[in-house]
Amino acid sequence: MSTEGGMSFLSEQDRMNESEKDDHDFLFFNPLAQPFSKWYELHKRLNLFPWWIRYNLGSAKEANLKDRILEVGKNLGLSTIWMNKIIRHSISEFSKKGLGFDYYGYHNIYHELEATYFTLLAASGQNKDNNFDLKDIKYLFLSALFHDYDPLKSFDKPNEDEVEWFIRKDKKIREWIEEEGLNIDIMMAMIHRTAYPFRGKIASGAIERMNHLFSKAGIPMEDEKTRKYYHDLGWFLSVSERVAGYALGNFDRAIELARLNAHGLGWHPSLINQESVKYFSVLKQEKEMLDRILNSVSEKYKQNFLENISKFKEAWIQEVEIKRSLRKNEISLIPVIEDKNVKIDPKIVNSIIDIRNDLNGPLLVNNKQDFAKSLSHPDTILVTLRVKEKDTMVIGFAKGGPLEQYRLRRGTNDANHGKKNTVFLESMYIRSGYWGEKGGHLLRLYFLTRSKELGYEYVTGYVHRDVLLRRSDKGEPIQLVQKYDPDKLDYYRIELNRFNYDPLF
């Protein structure tokens, strides 16, 4: 038996011996996959109760997506009752294990629902030469809905081996597979085909596992046609789930997805446009399947996808030009601590609100209306980042205030709450194109300086763990107060009287 990355795998001979056992036996086990505490799941259920009310009333966006899945699935011949109970189970399991609507990562339950809806849409538009039968549709439905089911993952990106472990361990999923006459090994082989990027060691490992699963499913090695058929069905799923979010939404949604993906991978914000262009370039290498899928959905979704690609390219070109201007000193950035005793120029206020409105996701601690009002609150600390040559041109800002005025993320308890000695830094926002040129460093430095001047002892907030560790390694007096896995959006605290205010720090 070989061991790799904390996982124990059976040898090939052991696998062959195991193939005679019941389909529900595991071919490998994950020693880290301990059951979630009942108290943890109860806590999640209680916290999610208001959302469940909205979901059951149909006002949550997940409920709308569920209804669209049921509609297209019914048209393809799937039982509404069967789909409904499986979707409900998936939402419940993802949510109570921390991967629900409040999870700050790309691979959350909404992505699973988007992937399922788009995959079924693409399947419904296949021509006669590529038509799927009802069993194929059932495989696609289940595989799309659970292809990222890895609640104990260490990173945002799931591990297909662990996904298989959790699916095989889930009694309800196994029963739904069996009652429809499906084979769990074929379903798992399709999910392994979603491994990304599908090249090099990742592809060879997935193919090896898929071949074993095909053998276990009773498909002999000689039956290359059937194996290729299910391999391609998994490929169809893989491309569909990667295209889904970028085809179903506009560029605002595409940017949100890119930011979530960047956060999960620990990228600096300055890499978002560049890496997004690379992502779509790699996808175009699968042109055969990509064209097949895009030609199977409505013109609206196809155009959404193509326009989003084009806009990412435009944003990257613009970003390159901005960086060139900054490095040639044609333009320069200056931070400004806004005086709360002086009314802010309406143009500056509008610029700040525009930057804020471009953002989405659970990092935003106020809604748009409350945010606008908070800019003029006497306790607000606001630092703007401007283009020196155009004084009123704001391209970023850092904003915060007394800790007591904020609701923290579930699970965060700050011992300083009520002591009025702590400032909460909401976040730092910079327009696309200006990241990576020390603007964020200047905003943060001036925000910390202003907080110290006002008599505060600490600054807290949420930041990706990799960023926090890098700052700690540089000697910053920064403390990790509350960890959050797998999204790694951790709560930190900085002790201001120990902070180095050297601008080059």
Give the residues covered by each predicted segment.
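Divalent metal-dependent phosphate-bond-processing catalytic cores, especially two-metal-ion Mg2+/Mn2+ enzymes
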Residues: 9-74, 106, 118-134, 146, ...
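Active-site flanking loop/helix segments enriched in acidic
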Residues: 88-116, 150
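Histidine- and acidic-residue-rich, metal-dependent catalytic cores
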Residues: 112, 119, 160-216
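His-Asp-centered metal-binding catalytic motifs of divalent-metal-dependent phosphohydrolases/nucleases
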Residues: 115, 135-153, 163, 188-195
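Short amphipathic alpha-helix that is part of the acyltransferase structural core
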Residues: 327-370, 384-386, 393
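Conserved acyl-donor/pantetheine-binding loop and adjacent beta-alpha core of acyl/acetyltransferases
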Residues: 390-427
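Conserved acetyl-CoA-binding loop-helix of GNAT-fold acetyltransferases
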Residues: 427-430, 436-449
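Conserved GNAT acetyl-CoA-binding A-motif
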Residues: 451-465
